[in-house]
UniProtKB/Swiss-Prot annotation:
Lineage of the species this protein comes from: Bacteria, Bacillati, Mycoplasmatota, Mycoplasmoidales, Metamycoplasmataceae
Record-linked PANTHER family: LARGE RIBOSOMAL SUBUNIT PROTEIN BL17M, RIBOSOMAL PROTEIN L17
Natural source organism: Mycoplasmopsis agalactiae (strain NCTC 10123 / CIP 59.7 / PG2)
GO cellular component terms attached to this protein's record: cytosolic large ribosomal subunit
GO biological process, alphabetically ordered: translation
Name of the protein this chain belongs to: Large ribosomal subunit protein bL17
GO MF: structural constituent of ribosome
Disulfide bonds, paired cysteine numbers: none
Pfam families the UniProt entry points to: Ribosomal_L17
Alphabetized HAMAP family for the sequence: Ribosomal_bL17
Length: 121
């Protein structure tokens, strides 16, 4: 399979914007449905941010804040950054990587694109 960043045929600004939105929604909801290529690219970004959040220094918090969108989590209207550092990262304290799981789905009916569900383990 080709490099996922080459498949989109879009510029860097568009790709980064889509990844920021998808990562923020994944952390807010726990699972999302997207295309397989986006899910594979999303996994890279999500796992790096969770690894940074496991060591809650000010520098790591600023790195994560610069990437995530200001999305609210429904539970108590917490910000997704606070949710990442207070809830998600401590639950993976003893886990060294492999924080996400990808399930393949049937192809989308309109354009036959391979679909997938990505979720936090």
């Amino acid at each position: 399979m080709a490099n996922p960043t080459q498949i989109y045929s879009r510029d860097v600004k568009w790709r980064k914007g889509v990844m920021r939105t998808l990562v923020s929604e994944l952390f807010a909801n726990g699972r999302i449905t997207t295309t397989l290529t986006r899910a594979k690219e999303l996994r890279r970004h999500a796992e790096k941010l969770i690894t940074k959040a496991k060591n809650p220094t000010l520098a790591n918090r600023r790195i994560c804040a610069s990437f995530l969108r200001p999305t609210l989590v429904e539970e108590g209207k917490k910000d997704v950054l606070k949710h990442l550092f207070d809830t998600i990262a401590p639950s993976y304290a003893k886990r060294n990587g492999g924080y996400t799981r990808i399930y393949k789905l049937v192809n989308r009916q309109g354009d036959n694109a391979p679909m997938a569900i990505i979720e936090l383990v």
